[in-house]
Regions:
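Bacterial N-terminal signal peptides that target proteins for export
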Residues: 1-12
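Mature, soluble, non-transmembrane domains
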Residues: 50, 68, 75-78, 88-150
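Generic hydrophobic/packing signal
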Residues: 10, 82, 86-89
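N-terminal secretory signal peptides
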Residues: 30-83
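Bacterial N-terminal signal peptides
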Residues: 11-20
Length: 150
């Protein structure tokens, strides 16, 4: 194989590996710091669904905010926790159901975001979940902005 063909073959292998690792084209959820630098990201599954998990500061229990990517941003589809008081904390009207051990609130009027500011503290342990990826957002800058990028 010529040197040029070897370089092309290696480039194709690297490109395939990046796509397989979720680093290729396609929408992703990205967390940026105050200066706009990327702190963390995760490729979105085909469904466009992702979540933020965290430890609630008042009730000291796990909670999950579930989102879905849309054209130009994302929507809060539901909030889930083992402790129903977490759902009360949001003060949103909507349908409450059970999913196994979890209480789930589906807001009547889901909040829509282009970007969403959030605090990522060690205490809250905020984590981005997209597909099978769990990306901790805490341990670096505290004040972040979440955005869906195409």
């Amino acid at each position: 194989m010529s040197a040029g063909a070897t370089i092309l073959a290696r480039g194709a292998l690297v490109g395939a590996a990046l796509v397989a690792a979720g680093c290729g084209a396609g929408p992703a959820v990205v967390a940026r710091d105050g200066a706009g630098h990327e702190v963390a990201s995760a490729a979105l599954p085909a469904s466009g669904e992702f979540a933020l998990t965290y430890r609630h500061s008042v009730y000291k229990t796990a909670a999950e905010e579930r989102f879905r990517a849309t054209d130009g941003g994302f929507v809060l589809d539901s909030i889930a926790s083992r402790d129903g008081r977490v759902l009360d904390y949001y003060e949103l009207d909507g349908a409450r159901t059970r999913e196994g051990a979890l209480w789930v609130l589906r807001p009547d009027r889901p909040a829509r975001f282009e970007t969403m500011p959030l605090a990522a503290t060690r205490r809250g342990q905020r984590t981005l979940v997209a597909g099978t990826r769990h990306v901790p957002l805490y341990g670096g800058p505290v004040h972040l902005k979440l955005v869906v990028e195409q």
